[in-house]
């Protein structure tokens, strides 16, 4: 039998699902469990993954939010079967290294996306490299968003970026209010 911990959002629907699961399973703390059931929406799942990013655990999401791109439907009758039949997906964090015009370097880690935004009323002038390859020579916009497949249905979708399959090995690079090149959607 799997050793389970349940983490849920605070909304009523999540709490109701949690109470059903707690009545069916003996739950453990994070250290003793080997699977963590996360009840909420995609945002809550991403928060939970980020908060627990150093754990080598399996996370199983149950949707009590809206879209549920990262989550599974809840069925109290089939929960054990659903857990055993679930497809495993590895979500790798995105590392962004940024160097500004004063050569200050910062590193960021994200599960869903990273964004670079203008800091004043003036548009940002950006170039985008992937390793040594220049992808975009000059982008004039309010900023740019680099999204992983896990984040492609959030902010990325709002800026007209593509939805990526969760198993995709791609990243979405989407401009935020681009001025040049015009009509580029990512």
Regions found by a protein language model. Give the residues of each.
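ATP/NTP phosphate-donor binding region
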Residues: 1-35, 39, 44-55, 74-90, ...
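Catalytic core of DAGKc-family lipid kinases
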Residues: 67-143
């Amino acid at each position: 039998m799997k050793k389970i911990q349940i983490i849920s959002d605070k909304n009523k629907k999540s709490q109701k699902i949690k109470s059903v699961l707690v009545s069916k399973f003996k739950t453990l703390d994070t250290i003793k469990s080997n699977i963590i059931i996360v009840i909420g929406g995609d945002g809550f799942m991403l928060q939970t993954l980020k908060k627990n990013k150093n754990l080598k655990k399996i996370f199983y999401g149950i949707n009590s939010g809206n879209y549920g791109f990262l989550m599974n439907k809840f069925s109290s009758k089939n929960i054990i079967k659903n857990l055993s039949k679930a497809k495993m997906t590895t979500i790798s964090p995105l590392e962004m290294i940024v160097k500004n015009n004063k050569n200050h370097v910062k590193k960021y880690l994200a599960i869903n996306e990273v964004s670079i935004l203008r800091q004043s009323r003036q548009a940002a002038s950006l170039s985008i490299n992937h390793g040594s390859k220049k992808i975009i020579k000059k982008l004039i916009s309010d900023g740019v968003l680099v999204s992983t497949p896990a984040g492609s249905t959030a902010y990325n979708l709002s800026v007209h970026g593509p939805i990526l399959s969760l198993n995709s090995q791609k990243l979405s690079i989407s401009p935020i209010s681009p001025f040049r090149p015009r009509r580029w959607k990512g």
